Amino acid sequence: MAEESNKLAFPSVVDRYFTRWYKPDIKGKPCEDHCILQHSNRICIITLAECHPLLQNEKTIKSISYQISANCSRLQNKVSGKSKRGAQFLTELAPLCRISSTDGEEYTIYSCIRGRLLEVNENILQNPGLLKEKPSTEGYIAVVLPKFEESKTITEGLLSQREYEEIVQSRAALRSETVQAVY
């Protein structure tokens, strides 16, 4: 009983050390939301938001590919040294990976922020279920380091957790109105 109350009293490591930022409806695609976990040392972790279609509707992930084009694979990213030499530079709309589901849908996951790609999560290639089971921890997509000068401004186009929750609630209300209108 005491152990159960401790779980409720203490926030998770992610909630304790990271600030959640959201980018809803990437490239105008409804509900394709991304979450950016920003640490105080300015490192950002790109994940899927809770409302992303891959995490909803009992979808099963078929494959994940970091091969963006014939000449660009995020797996070829080799970073070294204090200044992170060799890291691929990303823009806000730079694709990180493509995820296919068993129902034939394909989703492109974008960087959402400008910065250097420090690492991609190769564990999800062997175990794609991590994306659904632990999207904010072991199922992350990539780690990005924004430029020092831009680290304060990268969140300008992103939503806070409270703002994002308001959008999710308005979507739910809109959906329920649509369902009621059909009947």
From Swiss-Prot:
InterPro entries found in the cross-reference section: Abitram, GCV_H/Fam206, Single_hybrid_motif
Molecular-function GO terms, alphabetical: actin filament binding; actin monomer binding
Swiss-Prot/TrEMBL GO biological process terms: dendrite morphogenesis; regulation of actin filament polymerization; regulation of filopodium assembly
Locations listed in the record: Nucleus speckle; Cell projection, Lamellipodium; Nucleus; Cell projection, Growth cone
A single cellular component GO annotation: dendrite
Gene3D superfamilies: 2.40.50.100
The entry's keywords: Cell projection, Nucleus
PANTHER family (alphabetical): PROTEIN ABITRAM
Protein family membership: Belongs to the ABITRAM family.
Role: May regulate actin polymerization, filopodia dynamics and arborization of neurons.
Protein name per the record: Protein Abitram
Source taxonomy: Eukaryota, Metazoa, Chordata, Craniata, Vertebrata
